[in-house]
C-alpha cells in the first residue's frame, strides 16, 4: 500500500491539525454514525476490538502458564499440552485480526479518488490505529516467548553444570539446540558426560519446549510482518493525531468550564438587574410620596 502521509500533511487551506482531530475523534466508541455504510464499517471495527481483547487476554494467560512451567522441574505433559494449545489459540486469533484488518483497509482506488473525503481519512486513521495496536500486542507476545526461551536455555545450562557437563560451551549448546531433534540433542550430551536420568529428562523436556517456542515465534512473526512496515511509516502521523485528540479534549473541558462560569455570571447579572430595578422603583415611589406630601402641605 502506497504511503501518502506527506499528502495528508500538506492538506488544503484548512489546518491539518484541526482536520486530523475531527477525523480521529471518530476512532473512539460513541462516534457519530454517518450512514449505513459507516454503520457496517463501525461494526467491523467493534468486532476487531473484541477479537483483540480476546487475544490480549490469551497473551496474559500464556505469560502466567509459562511462569508456572518454569517453576516446575519436570512439568506434566498436560501442562505442556495446555501451553501449546494456548499458543495455537493465540495464532488463530492473530490470523483472525489480520483478516479483519485487511477487510477494513481502504482500497487503493478508493483512497486515491476520495483522498480528501473525511470518511476515507477516518477509515485510514482507524485502520492505522488498530494495526498499530495489533503489532504492539504481537510484538509483546513474541518478546515474552523469546524471554521464556532464554530462561529454558538457562535451565538446561544449569543442569549441565550440575551434572558435571560444564565442558559444553554456549556455542556448542546452541548448535545442539538447533539440531531440531531431541534424540540428537540428548545423544550429543551423553557422549562425554554422565548425566542422571532425572536431569536428562528435564533437559530433554526443556529442549522440546524450546523447539515448540521457536516454531510459535516464527509463525506469529509471519502473521503481522505485512503490517509492521506500514505501521512504522504511519506511526508519526498516528502519534500526532493522538496528541491532537488529547489537546482537543483538554480544550473542550476548559471550554465547558468557561461556559459554566459564564452561565453563573449571567445568573448573577440577572439578579443584580432585578435588585437595581427594585431599588429604582422604591426610590421613585419615595420621591413621588415626598412630592405629593409637599404639594398637599403647600
UniProtKB/Swiss-Prot annotation:
It holds the Pfam family Syntaxin. One of its GO terms (biological process) is positive regulation of protein localization to cell surface. Belongs to the syntaxin family. SUPFAM superfamilies: t-snare proteins. One of its GO terms (molecular function) is SNAP receptor activity. It comes from the Eukaryota. The gene is Stx4. Residues 296-298 are extracellular. InterPro entries: SNARE (IPR010989), Syntaxin (IPR045242), Syntaxin/epimorphin_CS (IPR006012), Syntaxin_N (IPR006011), T_SNARE_dom (IPR000727). This is Syntaxin-4. Residues 1-274 are cytoplasmic. Keywords: Cell membrane, Cell projection, Coiled coil, Hearing, Membrane, Neurotransmitter transport, Phosphoprotein, Transmembrane, Transmembrane helix, Transport. Residues 200-262 form the t-SNARE coiled-coil homology domain. One of its GO terms (cellular component) is glutamatergic synapse. The chain crosses the membrane at residues 275-295. Residues 38-163 form a coiled coil. It comes from Mus musculus (Mouse). The modification Phosphoserine is found at residues 15, 29, 36, 117, 208, 248. Expressed in the outer and inner hair cells of the cochlea.
Amino acid at each position: 500500500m502506497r504511503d501518502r502521509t506527506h499528502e495528508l500533511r500538506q492538506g488544503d487551506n484548512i489546518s491539518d491539525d484541526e482536520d486530523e482531530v475531527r477525523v480521529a475523534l471518530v476512532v473512539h466508541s460513541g462516534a457519530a454514525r454517518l450512514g449505513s455504510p459507516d454503520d457496517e464499517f463501525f461494526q467491523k471495527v467493534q468486532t476487531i476490538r473484541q477479537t483483540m481483547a480476546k487475544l490480549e487476554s490469551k497473551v496474559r494467560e500464556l505469560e502466567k502458564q509459562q511462569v508456572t512451567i518454569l517453576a516446575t522441574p519436570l512439568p506434566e505433559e498436560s501442562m505442556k499440552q495446555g501451553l501449546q494449545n494456548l499458543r495455537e489459540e493465540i495464532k488463530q486469533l492473530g490470523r483472525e485480526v489480520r483478516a479483519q484488518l485487511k477487510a477494513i483497509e481502504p482500497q487503493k482506488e478508493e483512497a486515491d479518488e476520495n483522498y480528501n473525503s473525511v470518511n476515507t481519512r477516518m477509515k485510514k486513521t482507524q485502520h492505522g490505529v488498530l494495526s498499530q495496536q495489533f503489532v504492539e500486542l504481537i510484538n509483546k507476545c513474541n518478546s515474552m516467548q523469546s524471554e521464556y526461551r532464554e530462561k529454558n536455555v538457562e535451565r538446561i545450562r544449569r543442569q549441565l553444570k550440575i551434572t558435571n557437563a560444564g565442558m559444553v560451551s554456549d556455542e556448542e549448546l546452541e548448535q545442539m539446540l538447533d539440531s531440531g531433534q531431541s534424540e540428537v540433542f540428548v545423544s550429543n550430551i551423553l557422549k562425554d558426560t554422565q548425566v542422571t536420568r532425572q536431569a536428562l529428562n528435564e533437559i530433554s523436556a526443556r529442549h522440546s519446549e524450546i523447539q515448540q517456542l521457536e516454531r510459535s515465534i516464527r509463525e506469529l512473526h509471519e502473521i503481522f510482518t505485512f503490517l509492521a512496515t506500514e505501521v512504522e511509516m504511519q506511526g508519526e502521523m498516528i502519534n500526532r493525531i493522538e496528541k491532537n485528540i488529547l489537546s482537543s479534549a483538554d480544550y473542550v473541558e476548559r471550554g465547558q468550564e468557561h461556559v459554566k462560569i459564564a452561565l453563573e455570571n449571567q445568573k448573577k447579572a440577572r439578579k443584580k438587574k432585578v435588585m437595581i430595578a427594585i431599588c429604582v422603583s422604591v426610590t421613585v415611589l419615595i420621591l413621588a410620596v415626598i412630592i405629593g406630601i409637599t404639594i398637599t402641605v403647600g
